[in-house]
Amino acid sequence: MQDFFEYLNKSIDINDEAKAFISSVIKMREFKKGDILITQGQSKALDNYFVFSGFLRSYIIDNDGKEHTVQFAIKDWWISDYIAYYGKGEAMLSVECLSDCIVLQSDKISIEKVFEKFPHIETFHRKNLEKSFVRLNKRIVNQLQLNARDRYFNFINDFPKMESVAKNYHVASYLGITEQSLSRIRSQE
């Protein structure tokens, strides 16, 4: 939990009262490679995960049974199915550990309690959501505007260690290309 407080302290002051309260309502969890944290179609309350170590991805399985990677998450990133987390509906995405992971797990009710008691943490969280929103929009624009090779090099720049962890079809689906196209791009490096 100390790593999380150090992460917060980079941007805001966290006193001992805030640390104690956060520690009482948010859980540190360890998961193994291959563990599924959220399952597409899941209807119970969903959690949000802050990554301390490891690599995760969110993905959707389409009507033909094909997986499409939506997001990768690395150290100091958050991951969830935000449509369900904020909208209270069924999960549209699954979240999978691509390696052994240590995460901070928070449900919506607990995090709202933190925000009520410590408004400066809510401001910090909103700023992080804004960064995530920008990152998501950049990904959409790049997907529409860039060719596959440029999208691949952006991916390598954004996630330098992900290729050693993610399977080829994870990376290819994230880029919106086939595994064969990914192999061709890599061979041209």
What are these regions (language model features)?
Residues 32, 52-53, 74, 99:
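A cytosolic small-molecule/anion-sensing beta-strand core signal
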Residues 91, 110-147, 151:
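A small-molecule sensor/coupling module
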Residues 146-189:
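Phosphate-/nucleic-acid-contacting segments
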Residues 37-42:
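Short phosphate-coordinating micro-motif centered on Lys-Gly-acidic
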Residues 86-105:
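Ligand-binding loop in jelly-roll beta-barrel domains
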Residues 46-57, 75-76:
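Glycine- and acidic-residue-biased ligand/ion/polar-headgroup-sensing regions
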Residues 1-28, 84:
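Cyclic nucleotide-binding regulatory module and flanking cytosolic helices
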Residues 63-79:
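Short acidic-glycine-tyrosine-enriched beta hairpin
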